[in-house]
Amino acid sequence: MLAIRIERIGELAVVECKGRVVRSEAAFKLREAVTSLRNARIIVLDLSEVGAIEGGGLGMLLYLQRWAYGHKIQFKLFNPTRSVRDRLELVNPIAQLDIATVHEMMELLANAEHRYSLAA
């Protein structure tokens, strides 16, 4: 089972995932969550609490990457667990999935908060 929570800060959306992405239902749930964020400029998928990801989930990440690119949205993965990172490394040379570093994530959050406070 996959639980998803979305945090918005201005044009930044952080999609926090918890559980496993091993069945079609989980992959489709992830797709619905991410594609609902059409007005975001940056989408970060937090994988720190995802215990496993299988073929359908990996395929969905590739789909979401292409979807985001087509909508001029930056799509980044953040903090995948060791088991998820191992699976990602199998497809990453081909897919070029963007995995944000902690420093990059802190910078994204700081910039989003700054822009959000200026808009308020």
Locations of regions flagged by a protein language model:
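ABC-family nucleotide-binding domains
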Residues: 54
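STAS-like cytosolic regulatory interaction modules
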Residues: 1-51, 63-120
